[in-house]
A protein has these predicted regions:
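Hydrophobic alpha-helical transmembrane segments
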Residues: 37-45, 124-131
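Alpha-helical transmembrane segments of integral membrane proteins
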Residues: 24-27, 31, 50, 54, ...
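Lipid-exposed faces of alpha-helical membrane segments in multi-pass integral membrane proteins
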Residues: 35, 51-58, 122, 126
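Cytosolic-side membrane-entry/anchor segment at the start of a transmembrane helix
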Residues: 1-38
Length: 138
């Protein structure tokens, strides 16, 4: 195999990882909506909507983790295309691909994740605030 074929094979490997990470983000959002909707229906009558924050935070973390990983692999992909000599053939190591966009906090508050989870968190948060306000005004 010549160098160009190695590069194409390596890019295909990295592209497959990127696709899996994107698919994981999609699945996590689906599970988050399903589980949090079920919790909403069960906990609404009992008034314990604050419990919804536990799985919400866990799903938010998982989604952010996978987006971070996806960004790291996209950086690796770009380095392979650029012909970076620091990238070892067939290596999927992303240690040298860190930047400000690949930090977990940047992923958690990105445009594709934060609005989704903030919107979901708005319902139990508003319910808890109204309940507290109702309690304080008695």
């Amino acid at each position: 195999m010549d160098n160009e074929q190695y590069k194409i094979a390596h890019l295909n490997m990295v592209q497959n990882v990127i696709n899996r990470m994107g698919n994981n983000c999609f699945l996590i959002k689906g599970w988050a909506i399903t589980l949090l909707s079920a919790l909403l229906t069960v906990l609404w009558e009992k008034g314990h909507l604050w419990i919804m924050f536990i799985p919400l935070i866990l799903f938010w973390y998982l989604d952010s983790f996978y987006l971070r990983q996806e960004r790291l692999y996209r950086n690796l992909y770009n380095k392979i295309i650029a012909g970076d000599q620091a990238v070892v053939k067939y290596s999927l190591c992303t240690k040298n691909c860190e930047n400000n966009k690949t930090k977990l906090q940047a992923a958690a508050f990105s445009r594709s994740i934060a609005p989704f989870y903030v919107t979901i968190a708005a319902l139990p948060l508003s319910y808890c605030l109204f309940s507290l306000l109702k309690y304080l005004l008695k």
